[in-house]
């Protein structure tokens, strides 16, 4: 997985992230700024997910982006 693609295109990706994880706020997305670790932490915080589930959900979401 090449997370640099997400990070490098964060402005475009924010909408897709928000579609998947609607509890994330615009402020959350600004703080995340494309950083996977920040995204994992905010998803865990907003949804109460365990770390393993969060990582799997992000991997699944990334895989559906068609890269």
UniProtKB/Swiss-Prot annotation:
InterPro entries xref list: CsbD, UPF0337_stress_rsp, YjbJ, YjbJ_sf
One Pfam family linked to the record: CsbD
The family this protein is said to belong to: Belongs to the UPF0337 (CsbD) family.
Name this protein carries in UniProt: UPF0337 protein Atu4724
Species this chain originates from: Agrobacterium fabrum (strain C58 / ATCC 33970) (Agrobacterium tumefaciens (strain C58))
């Amino acid at each position: 997985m090449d997370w640099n693609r997400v990070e490098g295109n964060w402005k475009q990706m924010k909408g897709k992230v928000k579609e998947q994880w609607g509890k994330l706020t615009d402020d959350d997305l600004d703080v995340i700024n494309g950083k996977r670790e920040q995204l994992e932490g905010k998803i865990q915080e907003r949804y109460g997910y365990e770390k393993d589930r969060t990582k799997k959900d992000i991997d699944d979401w990334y895989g559906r982006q068609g890269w």
